[in-house]
Amino acid sequence: MSTIIAIDGPAAAGKGTLARRLAAELGFDYLDTGLIYRAVGMKLARAGLDPADVALAERAARQLSPDDLAATDLRIDEAAQAASKVASIPGVRAALLDFQRRFAATPPGGKGAVLDGRDIGTVVCPEAQVKLFVTASVEKRAERRLKELQEKGLGAIYGTVLADMRERDERDTNRAVAPLVPAQDAAVLDTSDLDADQAFAAALGIIGSKR
């Protein structure tokens, strides 16, 4: 059985950057679960089809492959909008839950898998050998998101970013299905006062103690 590393946490906590580095270091396959709904939505949008069409969206979700996640248009606004439409369809959510579990159980490289998201350790892969909950203060996360936006040339105000972050935290933490909470057996990694290298070293230490 391959090793599964589940990484959860709120927005801008650094979990995506950390997950990619860990996968590269360990020779594991990486799944950015945030892209899978975008990939399904864009499969339809590219073909001129409506992502809100239940039957079409469910079929696209069932046919999703890891190669679809390499598409270069998954970060554009249209992809986010398409993702929002398909994500509201229960059949799509069920198919993509199966996709994530298959990827984790039988990763393409065969050695192991790193998945990051909101509910990997609690819902998608509760059997994961290593579970990390990566977090940081909401103020620090807002600072990081503001910097990301500015580096992309997008104008943003700290107060607005902070308010949006708090609203998203509230929504993620209190939703009825798969709320954002650490798994009972997850190691919590607070990156508020850590740079990327320090967070990476801390995560490697946790993984080493669990394997």
From Swiss-Prot:
Annotated residues for binding of ATP: 9-17
Reaction catalysed by this enzyme: CMP + ATP = CDP + ADP; dCMP + ATP = dCDP + ADP
Swiss-Prot/TrEMBL keywords: ATP-binding, Cytoplasm, Kinase, Nucleotide-binding, Transferase
InterPro entries: Cytidylate_kin (IPR003136), Cytidylate_kinase_dom (IPR011994), P-loop_NTPase (IPR027417)
A Pfam family of this chain: Cytidylate_kin
GO molecular function, one term: dCMP kinase activity
GO BP annotation list: pyrimidine nucleotide metabolic process
A GO-annotated cellular component: cytoplasm
Keyword Glycosyltransferase: no
E.C. number(s) listed in UniProt: 2.7.4.25
Source organism, top-level taxon: Bacteria
Subcellular location: Cytoplasm
Chief subcellular location: cytoplasm
Signal sequence, renumbered to the chain: none
UniProt xrefs under CDD domains: CMPK
Keyword Translocase tagged: no
NCBIfam families, per the entry: cmk (TIGR00017)
Family, as annotated: Belongs to the cytidylate kinase family. Type 1 subfamily.
Descriptive protein name: Cytidylate kinase
Species of the source: Paramagnetospirillum magneticum (strain ATCC 700264 / AMB-1)
Gene: cmk
